[in-house]
Amino acid sequence: KTNTGATAYMGFLNAIAGNPEVLTEKHLENTNLIKDLTDLFKGVERVSGDETFLKEMFLNNDEYEAVIADEASLININTMLKNKKKEELYLIYPIDGVAINDSAFGFIDNKSNKKETFLKLQNYLLSDKFQGTLKEKGRRTWYGGTNDKVNEKVFNPDWGIDTKKYLNVTKFPSKKVMTEAINLYIESLRKPTHTVFCLDYSGSMNGTGIKELTSAMKYILDYNEASIDKLQFSKNDKITIILFSSKINGIY
């Protein structure tokens, strides 16, 4: 549901497939791979489409024992746990590879005389002051390699963070294979969901309102349309639709 979740999933795929040079469609058809991934995802209790919501969900529920997130988010979570005098997390890095977001920042010449502004912003982002701020927030300002000059109160070794150790980088397949892999997760690997739609059919929805509602539901429930944005349901999901106005008009 997030960049971190998707990249973690690709890492799981590569590892369970035996770390092939390139992940292919044939790997995704392997029944043993699908079984192993299904068993892995049985341990997932919740997912989130937003890193901030994921953090809040984890911090506000003591039942969760682990969370998959980016390093900076986990550092932030641990800082908050420490302040609350709660047990802190220990970070685990898959030896098969992690994804590194290099936060590319580029300029597209649109002939609007904005290059000077772009360069000012770029210089500020690369300044020692701002780079220092990023590091204090748990962001690695060096790409990949090692760094032995960090604030260990932030990159805390007691939390399993070792900036002196080189991180292996996840190998990503082609866009087509990634799309099929995500569809495989949505339609076969994740736990099934029960989604309830409560649709307002009252008089206030007459005209444009009901047309937009109907159009939205057609989009969501049409597999081909919904799959464009990875919103499709799987055959194991349960869908309930409740129509209401001043009373419940029907349940389907």
Annotate each PLM feature.
Residues 1, 69-72, 94-96, 108, ...:
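Active-site-proximal beta-strand/loop segments in catalytic clefts of secreted hydrolases
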Residues 20-91:
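Ligand-binding pocket segment of bilobal, Venus flytrap-like solute-binding proteins
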Residues 113-125:
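Short amphipathic alpha-helical coupling segments at ligand-binding clamshell hinges
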Residues 101-116, 133-137:
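A bilobed periplasmic-binding-protein/Venus flytrap-type ligand-binding module shared by bacterial periplasmic
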Residues 1-15:
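A conserved helix-loop-strand patch within extracytoplasmic ligand-binding domains
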Residues 189-252:
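Von Willebrand factor
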Residues 124-146:
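Periplasmic-binding protein-like
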Residues 141-196, 203-211:
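Acidic, polar low-complexity linker/tail segments
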